[in-house]
């Protein structure tokens, strides 16, 4: 992948851009094998490769510059703004959308927030696309509600220019800290979420719910989890840290008793919408802390699926799983180092198979799926 900003030394988000893609995959697989060298692994499966450009479905842009000539991109360490509208990680058609958004910012008088001076209103714009129908969600992250009336006044123009923007909202983030979003979300459109479809499974994206940024690889990851679980012929499972329900909904059929747990109420609403669309009757999704939910249960299903944040599932949950000993644990991880530490605590399990999914090309990061069987 060629990147003008990387070559010029303006952006180094893709730390591995100088490596060939085959070299990147080789290094990631080697890293994963080193982390799991103390654990018994029956089958090492080949890594799942990504497209090397145009694979992201979401752009998170810092807004800077002036209200007349806003810049969308990132803040350099020296304080300069790097405009990333032509970033090759995004599909090419994002560029035209960014240009219209810049005009809208000027028309609405949304003054970009200046970190140094602590002045201005517009901090970020977040743009997400559904690959299922090409609809888009646009979020404006504002310091306050001061400019909402101005924003709403010019909104019809924006919707006329970009009819694919079916969900538009403002998030209010008043603190002067490196926090992406605040608690308050104001939705301006009748539609409140995007519909995505992976492998025939409807999934929904709401403004504040997490969703994978590489849909092709996410689709492969969910499909693989579904295949592995169906081969086990189980009748009950938990999907902990379930997000919008992607894993559990790919694994469950109409007879499977599935319980999905996720701290985000927005994500749980999305998961419930998906389950309803699929007509699943034995599925339950709850907005709870996954670890607390598990620790309170005296019985455990045949399979526990975990997809934790980067910190992993931690000692408490590992000790609980060791004590309760479900037949299977399916572990999906965005941080193989914490996953390896967790698996090392699950001493009575062996890894039946493990596979690397290259969710984040040109970086050291990757996703891992590991099936653990009670030995």
Swiss-Prot record:
The reaction(s) this protein catalyses: uridine(747) in 23S rRNA + S-adenosyl-L-methionine = 5-methyluridine(747) in 23S rRNA + S-adenosyl-L-homocysteine + H(+)
Gene: rlmC
Residues forming the catalytic site: 334
Span of the signal peptide: none
Summary of the function given for this chain in its UniProt record: Catalyzes the formation of 5-methyl-uridine at position 747 (m5U747) in 23S rRNA.
Keywords: 4Fe-4S, Iron, Iron-sulfur, Metal-binding, Methyltransferase, rRNA processing, S-adenosyl-L-methionine, Transferase
GO terms of biological process kind: rRNA base methylation
Protein name: 23S rRNA (uracil(747)-C(5))-methyltransferase RlmC
Pfam annotation, one family: tRNA_U5-meth_tr
């Amino acid at each position: 992948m060629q990147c003008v900003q990387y070559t010029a030394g303006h952006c180094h988000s893709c730390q591995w851009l100088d490596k060939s893609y085959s070299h990147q995959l080789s290094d990631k697989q080697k890293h994963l094998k080193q982390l799991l060298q103390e654990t018994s692994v029956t089958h090492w499966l080949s890594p799942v490769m990504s497209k090397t450009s145009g694979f992201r479905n979401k752009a998170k842009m810092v807004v800077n510059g002036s209200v007349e000539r806003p810049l969308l991109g990132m803040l350099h360490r020296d304080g300069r703004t790097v405009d990333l509208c032509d970033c090759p990680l995004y599909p090419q058609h994002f560029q035209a959308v960014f240009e219209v958004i810049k005009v809208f910012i000027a028309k609405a008088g949304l003054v970009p927030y200046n970190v140094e001076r602590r002045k201005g209103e517009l901090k970020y714009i977040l743009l997400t696309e559904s690959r299922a129908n090409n609809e888009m969600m646009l979020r404006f992250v504002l310091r306050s509600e001061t400019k909402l009336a101005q924003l709403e006044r010019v909104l019809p123009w924006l919707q006329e220019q970009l009819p694919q923007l079916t969900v538009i909202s403002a998030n209010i983030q008043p603190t002067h800290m490196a926090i992406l979003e605040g608690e308050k979300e104001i939705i301006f459109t009748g539609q409140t979420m995007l519909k995505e479809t992976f492998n025939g499974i409807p999934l929904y994206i709401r403004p504040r719910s997490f969703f994978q940024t590489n849909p092709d690889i996410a689709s492969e990851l969910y499909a693989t989890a579904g295949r592995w679980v169906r081969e086990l012929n189980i009748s009950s499972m938990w999907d902990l840290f379930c997000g919008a329900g992607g894993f559990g909904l790919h694994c469950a059929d109409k007879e499977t008793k599935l319980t999905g747990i996720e701290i985000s109420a927005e994500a749980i609403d999305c998961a419930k919408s998906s389950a309803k669309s699929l007509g699943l009757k034995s599925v339950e999704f709850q907005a709870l802390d996954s670890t607390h939910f598990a620790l309170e249960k005296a019985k455990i299903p045949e399979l526990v699926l975990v997809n934790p944040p980067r910190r992993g599932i931690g000692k408490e949950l590992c000790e609980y799983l060791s004590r309760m000993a479900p037949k299977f644990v399916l572990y999906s991880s965005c941080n193989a180092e914490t996953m390896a530490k967790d698996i090392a605590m699950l001493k009575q399990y062996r890894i039946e198979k493990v596979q690397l999914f290259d969710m984040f090309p040109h970086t050291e990061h990757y996703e891992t799926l590991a099936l653990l069987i009670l030995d």
